Amino acid sequence: MAHDPVHDEDVAEVSHLTAEAASALIRGDVRRYLTFIGHADDYTLLQPFGGEPRRGFDSSDEALEATARFFHGGDAHVEVIESYASGDLVVLVVIERQHGEVGDLPDQDWSLRVTLVFRREEGGWRLAHRHATPLVHPITLEQAAALARGS
């Protein structure tokens, strides 16, 4: 089904939903996160901890509860660096400036550089892809080499 062209208002809506979702997630409020962001059936994730790409979004109660336990007491502000729109896609390049308790670690800066690809589907905008890296702060070539080696 053909949709109307993407307008500035669509990009603003997706940006707003992204900011609300980031704030909810870093607080561990996964169910609230899901009120802002729906995931496409072919969703892919390149998570900030590395590893193989994830395919699909596990919305089982067990997965949502595990995610909720992983994040605590944080706050986030999303800085949109650039946005692109074409056809039924909106791409956001953002920095999620956030802090919180992640895993068993105390509260700290967890800011991420993130690329998000949203696709317009029946029922609204769905997140099709997320690529996040924690490299908001510069690192040395040697540190990058160690990360690339997996050490």
Predicted segments, located by residue:
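Short beta-strand edge/turn micro-motifs at domain boundaries
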Residues: 110-141
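Hydrophobic/aromatic beta-strand elements that line small-molecule binding cavities or substrate pockets
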Residues: 21, 78-83, 96-98, 113-119, ...
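Short, low-complexity N-terminal intrinsically disordered segments enriched in polar/charged residues
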Residues: 1-36, 146-151
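Short, cysteine-centered beta-strand-loop-beta hairpins and adjacent loop/turn segments enriched
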Residues: 70-71, 99-108
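Residue-level preference for beta-strand/loop junctions
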Residues: 88, 92-94, 109-110
